[in-house]
Design a protein with these regions (language model features):
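N-terminal non-catalytic structural scaffold regions of very large proteins
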Residues: 1-275
Length: 275
């Protein structure tokens, strides 16, 4: 992570690259990255009531004990008043009592992040709000003015699901696998003109061929243990699942769900007998 909380990776201590580019390089699209690491919820604008309709989700109340006004979409009754203290347990009780769809104000969307790209005009630079865009009054107004009434929002909060990877995706200029692999090639071989075929071959040779990369059986066992993976210790190259698990672990570390390994602990080092 850097000071802006973007997630990066490095190869051979060279220039850092967005972690989202690594995920694209192994075949993920930006949509698939968002789906892998974040749940999402749909919001639809009700023009008659001037409110946004969505499913009631108790998870949204883990990070706060107060709330904006919430209206039962079915009955029209106010179930949570503005400023009421609502705990996660209280929210779960609302759900168990039958609260399903709710209406919320536009302000309740402020600070949330788009789970899918939204195109509001043909302007390639200003007319597209990418995955991870943080919503505010101006952006929501532009979306509605473009006659877009339904959007998908990533579920994030300040307690256990930060928007770090969403921010990384938003700032990543690469859009697909070829873009990502080409950038990685340029970092590894600066000054050499890249072609897609050569860049792909170099990237695959880095980690995914046994002739060039070997975790060793000990490395595989340690990786399986640290990342809770089930993989034969005979597989000593990196797999896509390993990279995905590493990114999940990095997000967990940033969210305080895990602890960083102690580099000085011998359990985290390869110890060989001498003599």
């Amino acid at each position: 992570y850097d000071v802006k909380d973007f997630l990066y990776f490095k190869i051979d201590r060279k220039k850092k690259i967005f972690a989202s580019s690594l995920l694209m390089a192994i075949g993920f699209t930006k949509n698939e990255i968002a789906d892998e690491f974040y749940d999402n919820e749909q919001y639809s604008f009700d023009i008659k009531k001037n409110k946004w309709k969505t499913k009631f989700n108790p998870e949204n109340y883990k990070a706060k004990n107060f709330s904006e006004e919430v209206i039962d979409a079915k009955t029209g009754n106010v179930v949570i008043k503005l400023g009421d203290k609502v705990s996660y347990l209280s929210a779960k009780k609302f759900a168990s009592d039958g609260l399903k769809d709710i209406l919320v104000s536009q302000e309740s969307l402020f600070g949330k992040h788009l789970h899918r790209e939204v195109k509001v005009s043909d302007d390639e630079e200003e007319g597209v709000f990418g995955i991870g865009t943080e919503l505010n009054d101006s952006i929501i107004k532009q979306i509605l003015e473009a006659s877009i009434s339904t959007i998908q929002i990533s579920i994030t909060n300040s307690i256990n699901k930060g928007a770090y990877l969403l921010a990384t995706i938003l700032n990543d200029k690469n859009n697909d696998k070829n873009d990502a692999i080409t950038e990685i090639y340029k970092v590894l071989r600066p000054g050499e003109p890249p072609t897609t075929e050569i860049a792909t071959q170099i990237f695959n040779n880095l980690f995914f061929t046994s002739e060039r990369y070997d975790l060793s059986d000990v490395g595989r066992v340690k990786m399986n243990s640290r990342l809770n993976l089930e993989c034969s210790d005979k597989i000593t190259i990196l797999r896509n699942d390993d990279i995905i698990a590493i990114v999940h672990k990095m997000l967990d570390l940033r969210d305080g769900k895990d602890e960083v390994d102690d580099i000085d602990h011998l359990g985290n080092r390869r110890v060989r007998s001498v003599g």
